[in-house]
Amino acid sequence: MSKIFTRSFRVRWGELDPSGTVSPANYLRYLIETAWDWGTAMGWDANYSQNPDVFWVIRETEIHILHSLRHNDEFGLTIWMVNWKGVRGTRCFELKFKDSDEVIAQGTQQVVLESASGKQA
């Protein structure tokens, strides 16, 4: 697994809440899109994700927003794995303005389950 992966984004108007800033759900969408692209870059494409025996469950997500994102802001989301033990892995991420400082830092706990029994693989 590549240790670090970065993807670029530009904030679209549909990602904003009534206050004109990115809604919390869209920060999670950015994370999922980046994680998906990270997997695809490693060969874990849609065919791999359709494996009926294994699936990913996100147990916990913690996001610290340091600066609000607004329409047309451009930023990169960098993701990396910090720990993998048994069926649990922890990955971190940070968002940085294209030419500036950190926007968000996050840690996500994941677990791989066997779908037939629902037990940890």
Regions found by a protein language model. Name each.
Residues 1-59, 114-121:
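Hot-dog-fold acyl-thioester-processing enzymes
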Residues 54, 59, 67, 76-79:
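Short secondary-structure boundary segments
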Residues 3-7, 64-74, 81-121:
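HotDog/MaoC-like acyl-thioester-processing domains
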